[in-house]
């Protein structure tokens, strides 16, 4: 699909519900002691996998994704393997849950997910007492023999909300306390939600301490996804004639790293929290920012914006001076090798960019000429290069653009709403 340059970009929009929070709301409601009501869940390929696995384990769901009632039941061993699709969150979080049930399960995924590392969850969960068998001890398919677990103190090798969440979810049914210590802070939805549900959780910096507990069902409205909003917010800053407002979006401080970096770069941007519902929710406003300055992204912000880091390269094209991202090797272990895909495709569009093992450097100001790109089936890269097309000279042809359905099924629909061509 060819995305042509836009004359003007303007509008007020709300983005789809938060994917990370939807996964966790579904899982926690299935683990609760009584029924829950969930509002505004994101329905996409990834979250459907979590829903379907929980259903196969015995959880009963009623209603639709705008209002869903969840009736938990004790999990029963499934007869067939459980399909995780392309969803790393489903795989890693459900590994933690399933490790704590004395039954046998098998998780498998598509070819992209089957290349993503799982040793990082296998290791701590085996220390707690579960048994795993995986391809090369690291990749899906993966068999889990759950057990009665013991709490552990575990230092994660990388800052990863998925690994932290897997261990904490396993710890809910373990004997004794579970402690997770990260090298840097990662998004905190799991511990924040558990704490709000009355589970004894203490957070001190990068250390999370959890005591085993049960909790009652709950009511929750899922806010808009800041990672989806990010594409529109960046577009608003780099387009020469733009004003965009995003409403009802999640503003959890462990997710606003991109907004912080944009402020450092001098973007015309502001955000405010308007309500709290297990998570802070609010509004982001952005307009054309002609005086962007290059920046070295601070290391402590990298895990708080891992999904948004490639967008920093797009900002860097239109910023004066050097924009540098380092300590982001984790980007190579996403749905695609996002560093390689970013660099190769930017070069196709006439942008000069330098690749590092753990990041990239771009020197602005430059322009995006146009051309064809291949996001390699990665939803976030397809959206990034679609935004690039709107600020290019000749337009950008995005191969396999349908892959955006993984997280943002109505992305192009919303884009059409704000673009004046």
From Swiss-Prot:
Record-linked SUPFAM superfamilies: EPT/RTPC-like
Active-site annotation: 307 (proton acceptor)
Keywords: Amino-acid biosynthesis, Aromatic amino acid biosynthesis, Cytoplasm, Transferase
Disulfide bonds listed in the record: none
One GO cellular component term: cytoplasm
Enzyme Commission number(s): 2.5.1.19
GO molecular function, one term: 3-phosphoshikimate 1-carboxyvinyltransferase activity
Binding site for 3-phosphoshikimate: 19-20, 24, 160, 162, 307, 334
Catalytic activity from the UniProt record: 3-phosphoshikimate + phosphoenolpyruvate = 5-O-(1-carboxyvinyl)-3-phosphoshikimate + phosphate
One of the protein's GO biological processes: aromatic amino acid family biosynthetic process
One protein family per Pfam: EPSP_synthase
Record-linked PANTHER family: AROM/DEHYDROQUINATE SYNTHASE, PENTAFUNCTIONAL AROM POLYPEPTIDE
Family annotation (NCBIfam families): aroA
Family: Belongs to the EPSP synthase family.
Subunit relationships: Monomer.
The protein, known as: 3-phosphoshikimate 1-carboxyvinyltransferase
Organism expressing this protein natively: Thermotoga neapolitana (strain ATCC 49049 / DSM 4359 / NBRC 107923 / NS-E)
GN (gene name): aroA
């Amino acid at each position: 699909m060819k995305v042509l340059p836009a004359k003007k970009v303007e509008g007020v929009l709300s983005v789809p519900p938060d994917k990370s929070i939807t996964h966790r709301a579904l899982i926690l409601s299935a683990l609760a002691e009584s029924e829950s009501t969930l509002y505004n869940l994101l329905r996409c390929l990834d979250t459907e996998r979590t829903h379907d696995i929980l259903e196969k384990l015995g959880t009963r769901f009623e209603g639709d994704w705008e209002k869903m009632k969840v009736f938990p039941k004790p999990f029963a061993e499934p007869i067939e393997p459980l399909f995780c699709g392309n969803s790393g969150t489903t795989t890693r979080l459900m590994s933690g849950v399933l490790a704590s049930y004395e039954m046998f399960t098998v998780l498998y995924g598509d070819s992209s997910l089957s290349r993503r590392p799982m040793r990082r969850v296998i290791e701590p969960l085996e220390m707690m007492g579960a048994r795993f068998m995986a391809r090369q001890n690291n990749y899906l398919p993966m068999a889990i023999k759950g057990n009665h677990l013991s709490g552990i103190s575990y230092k994660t090798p990388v800052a990863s909300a998925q690994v932290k969440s897997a261990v904490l979810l396993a710890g809910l049914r373990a004997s004794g306390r579970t402690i997770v210590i990260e090298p840097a802070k990662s998004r905190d939805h799991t511990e924040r939600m558990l704490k709000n549900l009355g589970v004894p959780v203490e957070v001190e910096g990068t250390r999370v301490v959890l005591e085993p507990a049960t909790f009652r069902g709950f009511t929750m409205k899922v806010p808009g996804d800041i990672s989806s909003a990010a594409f529109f917010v960046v577009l608003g800053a780099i387009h020469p004639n733009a004003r965009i407002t995003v409403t009802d979006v999640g503003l959890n401080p462990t997710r606003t790293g991109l907004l912080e970096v944009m402020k450092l770069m001098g973007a015309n941007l502001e955000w405010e929290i308007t309500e709290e519902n297990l998570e802070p929710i609010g509004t982001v406003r952005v307009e054309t920012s002609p005086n962007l300055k290059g920046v070295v992204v601070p290391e402590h912000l990298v895990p708080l914006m891992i999904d948004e880091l490639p967008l920093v390269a797009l900002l860097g094209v239109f910023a004066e001076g050097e924009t540098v991202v380092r300590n982001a090797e984790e980007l190579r272990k996403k749905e695609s090798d996002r560093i390689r895909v970013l660099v190769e495709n930017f070069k196709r569009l006439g942008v000069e960019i330098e690749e590092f093992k753990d990041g990239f450097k771009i020197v602005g100001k430059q322009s995006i000429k146009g051309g064809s790109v291949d996001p390699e089936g990665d939803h976030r890269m397809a959206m990034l290069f679609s935004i690039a097309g709107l600020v290019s000279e000749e337009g950008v042809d995005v191969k396999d653009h349908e892959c955006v359905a993984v997280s943002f099924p109505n992305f192009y629909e919303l884009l059409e709403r704000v673009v004046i061509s």
